[in-house]
Each structure stands twice: as C-alpha cells, then as structure tokens.
Amino acid sequence: MHPRPHLITLSILAGMYILTQVIIVPALPDLQSQFKTDYKTIQFTISGYLLAVALVNFIAGPLSDRYGRRTIMLIFFFIFMLGSVGCFLSETLSTFLFFRILQASSAAGLVLSRAIIGDISSEKETVKMLGLLSIAMGIAPSLAPLVGGIINDFFGAKQIFLFLSIVSIFLLFIIFYDLKETNFKQTEDIFAQIKSYPILLISMNFWLPTITFSLSFSIFGVFFIGGPFIASKVFNLTPTVTGFYLACPSLGYILGNVLVSRIANIVSTKRLMFWGSLLLTSGPICSLIFCISFFHPLCFYLPVLLMTFG
C-alpha cells in the first residue's frame, strides 16, 4: 500500500506556484520605482516567471519518474527557497530577475502533486482529488494579491519575498516529514515520457483542448501584468485595494469550477466549451462598454470575473 500524504499538503504545494506568481502583482509599481526601471521591464517578473514555469512543467515529471517524487520535490522547493531569499536580498534588477526565475521551481508542486495522486489513488479517487486541487489553485490567486498588497502597504514591496522565504522553509519542513515516496516503479530511462511527446504533437485531441485552455489562461497573464498599472496610474488605487480587485478573476475561476463539477455529467464537454468561450468573449465587450460609460474600477475589473468564470 502506498504511503498517503495529507491532501492539504498536496493542495498547498500545488497552489504555491500561482500564489508566488500573483502575490507580487500589487507591488509591481513600487518594485518599478525601487529598481528605477520602466514598467515594461518590471513586467518580466511575471512573463519571465511563467516561461520558467513552463520549463519546470516539462522536466519535473520525467525527473520524478526516474529519481522519485519526494527527492525531486525537495530539490525544487530548496531552489524555490534560494530564489525567494535571493529576491529579498537583491540590490540590482538583473540579480532580482535571476532569482525571480528560480522561484518558478515551485511549479514542481503542481506537477508532482498530480503525479502523487495518480500513484496513491484509484481512477475514481484521482478525479475527485484533482478537483480538490483545482479549488486550491483557485483559492491561492484569490488571497495572494490581497496579502501581497497588505504586506506592500505596511512593510514594503521586497518584504513580500521575506514572507515567501519563510513560507518556503515551512514547505520544506512539511515535504520532509509528510511526503513519503510514492513512486515505486521508477524508470531507468529519464527520457521515456519525453519520447511520447511527438505522439501528442500530431493529435488533434491534444491540440484543441490545449489551445482552448492556453488562450483562456492567457487572460490571467494579461490581467495580472496590466492590471496593477491601470490600478495605480489610471484609478490611483493603493496596493491593498489593488489586491482586492485583482482577486476578481480567481473568484470567477472558482465559481466556474464548482458549476462544471456539478453539471459535467449532464452537459456535453463540447457544449460546456461553447458556453465557456461565449462568456470569455462577452467579458471584454462588457468591460469596454462599462469603461466608456462609467469611470470606476469595478467597470474594468468585474467583467474579468465573467471571463474567468467561462
């Protein structure tokens, strides 16, 4: 029988990369001022981080198949700790961006949590547990901007990375004590999984949902990169209030997941994707109409909730 880590442990690890992504978003204007750079450059703390997350997603799974889930999880979260401490201590923009990229190693938490669930659960249990992980991933970006905004207002932008450093030490502790090895069929060929990728690349069953998901998820990226600038320069909002408004897309994501989990058995996937795409399209149109008619932050931020709900 496989040793079972607590589900709360897997949920925290799975949500950590997106929390790390968005917790600094309300502080971007202040980080821009501290490093004396332009907003386009400081945005790389989000876009560069996401590129590194994609790389971690690519390599973490095969590495854990070869060397074990627990070992790779510990290594990647140790790198995450180094990145968080490095960001806090950085005096120059280039050093800061380097350590920010290292923080993307936290994405291993999502990849390996899913793999661990596959190791320890039956097919039916796996679906249920992955649904709970999705909720955790929705909660993290809901709370993170607000937490980041409060820390920025009361202690300063770089103190966010001190907070993440403390969290990373806690995560290493719970990985060490709660996460036992679950992969007892470790492969000798580290490239075994990667060799199957060409099969996926020629499959329309892979590309259609992947493109749909990628375009949908890009809403988060665009919103979290441009949202703080609009909040600060257009609406003159404080980081704490900005964090509150930036929670809107995550709330839509949670509500959408809850609804889909309840109607997935009675509504076809194709129909769900159609209505979801319709909501995605209607969001920006509503935002444009509202912003032309009224000058208020809600006119810009609330329609994003509609988009992420879809």
What are these regions (language model features)?
Residues 79, 83-86, 94-102, 298-306:
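Paired small-residue
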